[in-house]
Amino acid sequence: MAHPASNLPPVLRPEHPPVRALDDLAARFGTSTRGETDGVTLTGVTLATADLRPGEAFVAIQGVNRHGAEFAAQAAEKGAVAVVTDAAGADIAAGSGLPIVIVDSPRAVLGDLSAWVYGTGADDELPLLFGTTGTNGKTSVSHLLEGILNQLGVVTGLSSTAERHIAGQVIVSRLTTPEASEFHALLALMRERGVEAVAVEVSAQALSRHRVDGLMFDVAGFTNLSHDHLDDYADMREYFEAKLQLFHPDRSRRGVVSLDSSAGAEVAARSEVPVVTVICPAIAADPDAAADWTVEILEERQDGTTFRLAGPDGRSLTTVVPTIGRHMAANAGPAIVMLLEGGYAWESFVAALDGGRIEAYLPGRTERVSGERGPAVYVDFGHSPDAFEKTLAAVRHVTPGKVLFVMGADGDRDATKRLDMGRTGAEGSDIFIVTDHHPRFEEPDSIRATLLEGARRAGTPTELHEYSPPERAILEAVKLVGEGDAILWCGPGHQDYRDIRGVRTPYSARELSRRALRDAGWPVPEPHWPVPYPDDDTPLSDPTRDWR
């Protein structure tokens, strides 16, 4: 797959969108109108004036600080044919010269409205949709779904935190789950290009904020639940209830639920659609829980994890997931079962996978960025205590020497997990380096101090270090390890920027790691990820070079 040259997501629209009448839109979704709507037609909808194309309707919602209707005149200049907004927005947009359709809640109606505009609703002819939710593993399951489907000869689409794919074309991703208008346009484009099945990562926020409204998932998957996102939700119960929404007949037809976390049993019990269950006893909270399918870990190596998937009627296959970690095998098993529930024949999985391996690339998910010699260096997107615990255990299992852990925490995000993040990092490593991640508008010194306090509370003999610049952190990390040792850098994963006081600066933990190894004299592979830095041989440690 070719990576995009720009790190800005493109505006994606179907090449041949349906033409809809504004009067029909108003009749279906509106409570009233202002201005002349007769004879007005539209070919798309968007929330963002920056993405608006001529002939589209601009949907204006109330934001945190401003109402989107304040940009109605700008939308008109870019060729918008109408504004869809609430009563307050209609008053603000009155001077734009555009006809206005008033709805009770533009955010709540956007999904169904977009599905109607693009013909991507539950009753329309679409690719099969596989949606995965859970705290950890959503991205991995989505990429594994895509990889397995490709091995079955299926033309695929993907929407994940890391990337979006349309039949092999790679597109930059910014949100785990795109806004509803963007997603329905993407799905319509995928349909035009012959995509037969789509793997979708569905966040709790997407469910709460109506981003997947108007979609019908053929199969929904649940991975696990652990401490995260309490900046968005009052408590873990509210967070759980948000994810449970995916298992409702308005959103999915069938479900596959992992019982590895204690929340899985409740999802299975309360699901309003038929579900089958999967368990990996090697990592499950209750390894004796009864499930329809079982993932048995057979071998863990640096080049992959071998597992056996066994289920009803004596069905069984043995294959390899191409990353380290029992938790990755625990992601792969449900991915296979989701596809089976989607209608693909068991015999096709046996032919493609049994005795072989899953061919999937998981960007920034326990991704090895080092060469064959020297310390093994892995970069991961994990940013929760549970993710740290599982990933550190995976690295420890395949590492004969020391394990060095590098991490930072997001600013302006759930701060209640930081002490546990620090504690888990110290418990799972021999050397622990705390650095900066996305400080956003928080003081990075304060973030690091909390992480280090958590590390000290672990009471382990772990060697602790603190370096504010990530560039310095990885340089020092490489100095502290050698052949047979491993570095795990958690947090950045696939990301190509850092957010510092609202400014996104080019950044790649994968490339920084590769160059730090190169500067230390270790052989390194060529990058197979976008490189946001100058492509030259200047050492990372050169004081004249500002890599940030």
Model-identified regions with their sequence ranges:
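Short secondary-structure boundary segments
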Residues: 85-88, 202, 224, 259, ...
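Short, basic phosphate-binding NTP loop
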Residues: 2-133, 141-152, 290-291, 301, ...
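Short, hydrophobic beta-strand segments that form beta-sheet elements in well-ordered domains
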Residues: 44-45, 79-86, 200, 255-258, ...
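Receiver (REC) domain switch/active-site residues of two-component response regulators
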Residues: 81, 218, 430
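Phosphate-binding loop of NTP-binding sites
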Residues: 109-259, 263-274, 399, 524, ...
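ATP-dependent carboxylate-amine ligase
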Residues: 1-34, 54-57, 67, 314, ...
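Residue-level signal for inorganic ion chemistry
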Residues: 25, 56, 75, 113, ...
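Acidic, Mg2+-coordinating active-site environments of NTP-dependent enzymes
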Residues: 90-95, 208, 217-376, 454-460, ...
